[in-house]
Amino acid sequence: MLVIVGESASGKSTLQNMFINANPQYKKVITYTTRPMRKNEKNGADYHFVSVQEFESMIANNAFVEYTEYRGWYYGTAKADCNGENLVAVLTPSGLRALKRYGINTISVYLRFDRRSRLIKILQRGDEIDEAYRRNLSDYGQFNGVENEVDYIINNYDYTHDPQQVLEMLSLAITAEGKKNGI
């Protein structure tokens, strides 16, 4: 499974969608959340948006490889969605660690993006300024040291790489890992 990690508004989901569009044999892992949908999000495409009661029932039934509560909302990756080949997931560092503990073979990429540009993107997508600052600070702690946990790092400060270049980097990473692991 290709796992893309990166702070809020670093371009993870955009990169995931671009990669899948360029490589249709890959399938998006759609995670679950109890948070409200943002404008332009679609249930079953961006997330599985479920109620707290549904999510807690899934926890009780051991349906998740990993889940977390973040600012009052649940987020999680279902075990059933991690079966198969050619999967691409967008996760937090703790989500990546959980997949590895569960025994899922991963190729992990950290999409590094500068704080100022991320803050601007968060505000542009309509988040409140207090929420934007809070997310930026939270990411700082959560992603501290992630460079040592991933297989590859893509520095994408100020969009210096064009999308095609980033896709090529991902493809090279997958090819290299496949050869290394006999895939």
Map each language-model feature to its residues.
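Hydrophobic anchor at the beta1->P-loop junction of P-loop NTPases
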Residues: 4
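P-loop (Walker A) phosphate-binding loop of NTP-binding proteins
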Residues: 7
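Walker A/P-loop
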Residues: 12-13
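Post-Walker A helix-loop "phosphate-sensing" segment adjacent to the P-loop in P-loop NTPases
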Residues: 21-29
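ATP-dependent small-molecule kinase phosphotransfer cores
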Residues: 33-87
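Conserved phosphate-donor/acceptor-positioning beta-strand/loop module used by diverse small-molecule
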Residues: 88-92, 101-123
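Small-molecule kinase domains that catalyze NTP-dependent phosphoryl transfer to phosphate-bearing small molecules
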Residues: 127-183
